[in-house]
């Protein structure tokens, strides 16, 4: 069986180095280096670090614009999810959360008619496209800052960058 080959570019961002991975046609992920679920699902596939790549250059342009404080529509960017049908359903829902706005895990569970907000949290945590599919816009009960695969301090930075409102957790 032939091994799949992926291209990888690293992107320095205000929240840490991002690992961007695609094949010739699809974006497979944007991960903060060493986050939970880092490069999940790629297995023993060949990943080659490259200096340029058409899909990844489109993502870099988006990230540059995002970190400068504005957004662009990337709905036509070809995403290739590696996950369960349930996870894919949650990730599709996340894409509709507008810049600078938030929603709770419980509200997503209610909207998707899922009994458990924790199940939603698990799927949100395995989102392979940090920032692009905005899992950082999902908050806990009472709009509290909770879980983020690369750390809640990075989630707080992204939400503040977007001007979103949230409740800090008391220590």
PLM region descriptions:
Residues 1-114, 161, 165-171:
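Basic nucleic-acid-binding alpha-helical/helix-turn surface characteristic of O6-alkylguanine DNA
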Residues 119-120:
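Helix-turn-helix DNA-binding helix
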Residues 124, 128, 132:
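Major-groove DNA-recognition helix of helix-turn-helix-type DNA-binding domains
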Residues 132-139:
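Short Lys/Arg-enriched helix C-cap and helix-to-coil transition segments
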Residues 141-171:
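…primarily DNA-binding HTH/wHTH and HhH modules…
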């Amino acid at each position: 069986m032939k091994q799949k080959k992926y291209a990888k570019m690293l992107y320095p961002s205000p929240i840490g180095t991002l690992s961007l991975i695609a094949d010739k046609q699809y974006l497979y992920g944007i991960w903060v280096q060493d986050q939970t679920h880092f490069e999940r699902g790629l297995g023993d596939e060949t990943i080659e670090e490259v200096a340029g790549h058409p899909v990844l250059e489109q993502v870099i342009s988006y990230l540059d614009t995002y970190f400068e404080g504005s957004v662009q529509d990337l709905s036509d960017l070809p995403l290739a999810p590696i996950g369960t049908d349930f996870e894919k359903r949650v990730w599709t829902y996340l894409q509709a959360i507008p810049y600078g706005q938030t929603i709770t895990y419980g509200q997503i569970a209610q909207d998707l008619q899922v009994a458990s907000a924790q199940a939603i949290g698990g799927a949100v945590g395995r989102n392979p496209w940090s920032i692009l599919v905005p899992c950082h816009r999902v908050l806990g009960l009472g709009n509290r800052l909770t879980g983020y695969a690369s750390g809640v301090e990075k989630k707080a930075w992204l939400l503040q960058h977007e001007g979103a409102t949230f409740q800090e957790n008391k220590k």
